[in-house]
Amino acid sequence: MSITVLAFDFGTKSIGCAVGQSITGTAQALPAFKAQDGIPDWLKIEKCLKDWQPNIVVVGLPLNMDGSEQDLTHLARKFANRLNGRFGVKVELQDERLTTKQARDEIFQRGGYRALKKEKVDSISACLILESWFENGACGE
């Protein structure tokens, strides 16, 4: 059985979003959400959740290269907890080290410097977070 999964790449100004299916293990970028000091428009997040009806939501966990936590790590955990508390969705965290760099590299290769828009990078990062979550077998399939 395939499950639908939404992924978020949390940031204080922009939150990337992607959707995927466990049967294919691939993700598709969705429009990023603007945030102000890490606070998104919760109504837009709610609409996204209602539109896609995910079985699970994955939030990228920004860790330092040595695996230690940083300020943004705590904010991402808080965002994940709020998703669960507000909407009752199952939320899992996924290590997101190097996803932003990898997303920038992919976008640059496709469209050059002009294609490197922050929201696009964040949503491609969300795709990479979700695909790595699928690769790790986290969906239990």
Swiss-Prot record:
EC number, UniProt record: 3.1.-.-
Q: Establish whether keyword Repeat is in the entry.
A: no
Under the heading SMART domains, the entry gives: YqgFc
| GO terms, biological process | rRNA 5'-end processing
Which Gene Ontology terms of cellular component type are present? cytosol
Q: Where in the cell is it found?
A: Cytoplasm
* Stored Pfam families: RuvX (PF03652)
SUPFAM superfamilies for this protein = Ribonuclease H-like (SSF53098)
Which UniProt key words apply to this protein? Cytoplasm, Hydrolase, Nuclease, Ribosome biogenesis
Function per UniProt: Could be a nuclease involved in processing of the 5'-end of pre-16S rRNA.
Protein name per the record? Putative pre-16S rRNA nuclease
What organism does this protein naturally occur in?
Histophilus somni (strain 2336) (Haemophilus somnus)
